Amino acid sequence: MKDSVIRKLEGLLERNEEVLALLSDPSVIADQERFRALSKEYSQLEDVVKSFTAFQQATEDLEAAKEMLNEDDPELKEMAQEEMKEAKSVLETLEDELQILLLPKDPNDDNNAFIEIRAGAGGDEAAIFAGDLFRMYSKYSESNRWQIEVMNTNEGEHGGFKEVIAKISGEGVYGKLKFESGGHRVQRVPETESQGRVHTSACTVIVLPEIPEAEAIEINKADLKVDTFRASGAGGQHVNKTDSAIRITHIPTGIVVECQDQRSQHKNRAQAMSVLSARIQAVEDEKRRSEEESTRRNLVSSGDRSERIRTYNFPQGRMSDHRINLTLYRLNEVMEGVLDVIIEPLILENQADLLAALAED
């Protein structure tokens, strides 16, 4: 391992000890905000510290085995060779592990997320597929013990959704779901199709990290236009007699957010502001990325939300992710929420891309 990497790891080890000492400091314990921030940092350092400590131990074992080679006893020499072989194998594994742990982390990976699914080309069939996608993500959330809370729906005339927005809360939600942003295409025979012809329709999925209140960008109230209206259900009928639904327009960006799934106007407004904050933050992040972008671009992109990323072919039972040329004939499982078979390869491909970028630098 390079000396520069070793020095960086030693620095993280020292920082871990500092943070541990600070967490037992009464003045830090009294300051809840600082205590939470340090607790989070300590948790983030845990894996790299554990791996580097094991790496240091394996390095010592290797040096001790090398010294044993100088012994005259043939049995000790043989033992030393075995120990050297084992230590080298452990070091190789730990070096790969540490390289991954040192990769730049998306600060939002541990955050909750908002997921927005919109029917695109394909009319009723696109809306039905949007409903299928929402069910798929709901099943995946359940398997991870995440909570899913519907914030806004616009139901399709023959089932599904023209649009559905939900908040998913739990550990590492955004880090797992962020690569789902993009165009999702479906190829299947609609139930209403009498000739058995395969139709193609599409949906767009957007995944945004929830921005913690302390980190949220400040939104000027003068930049907001707030409208209230009656919440409506399927077919457009009004489902209550009070103006509990909220529509907020952010005038500078033109972003519009509607929330009507809560009975309380206050709750709908709070949820709408939360989604608005996430969308504005996403616009700012995209602008910054565009300014910083070099010729190199990540293979697995969570940025271009209009790009077609995946095809679900029902007649063939096939799911293809076009970003990493992954094809699986496990469509029924995927639609039942078995998504790690797609998500894990995407995460690994992203890590490989980041490693390649670091090597170039």
Curated annotation (Swiss-Prot):
Transmembrane segments: none annotated. InterPro entries: PCRF, Pep_chain_release_fac_I, Pep_chain_release_fac_I_sf, Prokaryotic/Mito_RF, RF-1. PROSITE patterns: RF_PROK_I. The keyword Magnesium does not apply. Methylated by PrmC. Methylation increases the termination efficiency of RF1. Residues 283-305 are annotated as: Disordered. GO terms for molecular function: translation release factor activity, codon specific. Its main location: cytoplasm. NCBIfam families: prfA, PRK00591.1. Peptide chain release factor 1 directs the termination of translation in response to the peptide chain termination codons UAG and UAA. PANTHER family: LD18447P. This is Peptide chain release factor 1. It comes from Shewanella woodyi (strain ATCC 51908 / MS32). The gene is prfA.
